[in-house]
Amino acid sequence: MNRNKLLNGNGGHIWVDGELLGNVKSVDFKLTGNFADIACCGDPATYAAYEGYAGEGTLETYKVNSELVTKIVEGFSTCVIPDTKIITKVENPVSGRAERWALTGVVFTEAAVAKFEAQKTIEESLPIKFTHAENLEKIKG
């Protein structure tokens, strides 16, 4: 194994609606397939019938401003949920190769309006749901 090909989070970047976030701690975005169990008489096997997918995840940040949380709360308060797009990029600084994804139909499902603790850096956990994930750039072997 060539350790210079390994990726790590230090090469990760997130853009929300075109704005690069410099305060990201971690991201975990995934698609989950929805499958129905199908059992047929005379066949002991259970089959999985694909019925669609759901996109969800969490953006973890260090709190440096109130802009994103305010946008989420305003959407909840006015019933006008913003149309949000997220771009992710993780790159290997040695090889210069990168993987990028675009998430569309993004909605933030939760926002903590106040959360802090003495002698602790404030972190925000922002759960999302999304409708589409498109690979913009992939790393080949």
Q: Which residues fall in each region the model found?
A:
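Short acidic DE-rich linear segments
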Residues: 137-141
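Solvent-exposed edge beta-strands and adjacent loop segments
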Residues: 1-71, 100, 104-125, 135
